[in-house]
Amino acid sequence: MDKEKEQDSLLDIKVGISLGDINGIGPEVVLKSLMDNRILQGCTPIVYGSVKTLNTIRKSIEGEEIFFNSCKDATEARRKKINVVQVWDEEPEIEYGKANETGGKYSFLSLEAATKDLAANKIDVLVTAPISKETIAKAGFQFPGHTEYLADLAGQKEALMMMVAENLRVALVTSHVALADVSKSLTREGILDKIEVLNQSLQRDFGIQRPRIAVLGFNPHAGENGKMGQEESETITPAINMAKGKDIIVNGPFPADGFFGSVALHQYDAILAMYHDQGLTPFKALAFDEGVNFTAGLPIVRTSPDH
């Protein structure tokens, strides 16, 4: 395939973008990304929101002028244009940095419209900007986060939150769960399901034929043979052994505190952490500027900025 045909093929990819909270960082990040001309060479972007709202926010940030192609529907999107599906016509009041009902309402409207088009195959990929979980819930959003919402829409029980950088992939067994509830959320079957989803995603989405997966423990020092907790011996290790019985290359549980500073980090294709901060704190320390949040286990591609 020559370069011209390759670029032509890339432009066939319609990337839907939900704005996130209009009072937050989401629209700014979206607009600054769209100012990079490479975007229009690699896909056809479709933002779900309003030209008026985007122009208002555009005035508050530095950078080149942006010209939008207003669409009633994603099918009207044009190549080499920054397309905006008009989800609303009114001009909501924007209060930067404030978590309020307005931000929640319009973040949900944008997300609903984008996911509706995704389900109808009008877009090929979904990129979601950050939401305020507190305010979007007041607008009727009944899920802990994007990952759970998209899994429900796709009818997938075991979607997996995974942070991805060039040389680092970290997935989570539990994601938006209170720390006090993590232990009782861990089951052998649940951990096994997450290992299987991660293994399949590494094969299908990342082209790794025989992935190597490291699983972290839950307690300090991975339980120290039961002296600091039973989760490793009663739940995590049995799940790992069950996965090995399914011909998955997986090892652990490794003590989480030292793993990310050890040689072992580079011997695996992905790490499976037990809970949100256990996996995301070291990931963001090592790869915050390049990290992407990828939802594994879905029949579609969904990403968001590391945040």
Segments (PLM) and residue ranges:
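Contiguous, glycine/small-aliphatic-enriched amphipathic segments in soluble metabolic enzymes
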Residues: 2-146, 189-274, 278-292, 296-307
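A generic local secondary-structure boundary/capping motif
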Residues: 73, 151, 159-162, 203-205
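Short, flexible loop segments at boundaries between secondary-structure elements
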Residues: 152-168, 298-307
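Ligand-binding beta-strand-loop-alpha-helix segment within the catalytic cores
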Residues: 163-192
